[in-house]
């Protein structure tokens, strides 16, 4: 299967908030884009497909430290099934995102506690996307 055309987006799906990142047109660099309410995600994806030219979406799957699919990963998989049904023109890719949020939140621990979570979600999505791009994902 040939890779889809356009940019790649990444989602760090949460219960309430979802971090969003997007690649550049050459699929070389990831940039944090925004944090949105998870309930508003279908509208955000429509906008990304239309305005950013996104053809592929990377979705972080929060496996356990043992690499197993736990409760959170099952919840993400359920949401991913709904997104796939609503966006048949987009290729969705699951990505093991273990510890991504912890890695990016370390430098932010010194900052204010309130609001930190929102900043971390889109940074986690960007880190995940950058790893994917560097490993040749979507190429």
Curated annotation (Swiss-Prot):
Pfam families: RuvX (PF03652). InterPro entries: RNaseH-like_sf, YqgF, YqgF/RNaseH-like_dom, YqgF/RNaseH-like_dom_sf. Its EC number is 3.1.-.-. It is found in: Cytoplasm. SUPFAM superfamilies: Ribonuclease H-like. GO terms for biological process: rRNA 5'-end processing. GO terms for molecular function: nuclease activity. Its main location: cytoplasm. Keywords: Cytoplasm, Hydrolase, Nuclease, Ribosome biogenesis. GO terms for cellular component: cytosol. It is an enzyme of class 3 (hydrolase). It comes from the Bacteria. The keyword Transcription does not apply. NCBIfam families: RNAse_H_YqgF. Belongs to the YqgF nuclease family. Could be a nuclease involved in processing of the 5'-end of pre-16S rRNA. This is Putative pre-16S rRNA nuclease.
């Amino acid at each position: 299967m040939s890779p889809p055309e356009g940019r790649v987006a990444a989602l760090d799906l949460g219960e309430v908030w979802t971090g969003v990142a997007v690649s550049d047109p050459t699929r070389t660099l990831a940039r944090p884009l925004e944090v949105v309410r998870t309930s508003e995600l279908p509208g955000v994806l429509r906008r990304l497909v239309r305005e950013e030219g996104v053809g592929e979406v990377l979705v972080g799957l929060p496996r356990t430290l043992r690499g197993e699919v736990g409760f959170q990963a099952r919840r993400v998989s359920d949401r991913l099934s709904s997104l796939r049904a609503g966006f048949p023109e987009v290729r969705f890719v699951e990505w093991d995102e273990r510890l991504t949020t912890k890695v990016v939140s370390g430098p932010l621990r010194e900052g204010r506690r309130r609001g930190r979570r929102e900043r971390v979600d889109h940074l986690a999505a960007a880190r995940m996307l950058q790893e994917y791009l560097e490993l040749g994902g979507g190429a």
